[in-house]
Every structure is written in structure tokens, then in C-alpha cells.
Amino acid sequence: MKTSIIPAIGKTALITSIFALIALNYGFKTEMSEQEWLNWSNKCLSNSFNPTPDINLKKWEITLTGDYFLRLRKTYQQGKQEYFSFNLHRLTNVDYLGSDTTGTLKFNTQTDDIIVQTYEDPEGNIDSMATSLGLPVHNMNTMRFDSLKIALNYFRMKSL
């Protein structure tokens, strides 16, 4: 009669260890998918945007699109709208000026690559281009800014 050289308890421990190693190996992803980066970036920008400096601001919308455009639309109480948009492959630098509680994200592009438009402005509609865009934010600590910068760089390199 053949008998195993591994006792029954040893077999159970060995099988359990193998399943644990398999679960550990396949349970963690090494990197986020593009959709996860996009969702996280939109959530970070939306949660961090600080509309309080514009007391007449009625509503706002900030979006990072799947085709690598960052878009900001502001609507004021009088009906005036401001619209800013640029493609991330034109982004050269992102800086953060401020503290952990409040500050400004400054986006810089290669040349006049940021679309600036106003609608229903009593002083006349504007359709121009800019090189930088300042975005007032709050609760932007160093780790969050670094993660956002990595995400934006990921999309910038992806769009090249």
C-alpha cells in the first residue's frame, strides 16, 4: 500500500498556501486602466475645484474627456458663460501655488493652445487663445497634486 510522505495536515497547509499565493498574485493590479485614471482625475478635479472666489458664479462644470481635453465651463448669475478648453498633449507644465487648504492649479501649454470663449457677455463675447489657465482649488495636498500630475502626464503621453 502506498502512503503519502506528506501528512494530512501538511497537505491541507500546502493546498491553502498555494491558494493564498494565487489569490495574492492575481488579487492586485500593477497599474490602473485608462478608464480608472479618467474617473479618478475627473473626481479629483471636481472635488478640488473651488468656486468661492467667484461670488457671482451660478454653476460650473469641469471635465477631462476621453479624447484628452480638459474643459471648464462657468455660468454666472447674469447668464454670462466662460468656457476654457485645451488638449493635454499641448500641456507643458502643471504647477500648484498655495497651501494644503487653498491654492491655484496653473496649467501651461506650448503656445496659445487654451481656447477661451465667453457667451452672453454684456461687454461683448470673446473668442481667443491663452497660454496658461489658473484653476482655484481647495484641499489639494502634496500627494493629491502629485497623483493628479501623474494622471495628466499619463494622458498627455497617451495622446501623442
Q: Where are these predicted regions, by residue range?
A:
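Bacterial Sec-dependent N-terminal signal peptides
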Residues: 1-37
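N-terminal secretory signal peptides
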Residues: 28-85, 93-94
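Hydrophobic residues embedded in beta-strands of well-ordered beta-sheets
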Residues: 67-70, 101-105
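A mature extracytoplasmic/lumenal domain signature
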Residues: 74-76, 87-92, 98-100, 109-113, ...
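Well-ordered beta-strand positions in beta-sheet-rich domains
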Residues: 83-88, 132-134
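C-terminal partner/receptor-binding element of secreted or periplasmic proteins
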Residues: 124-160
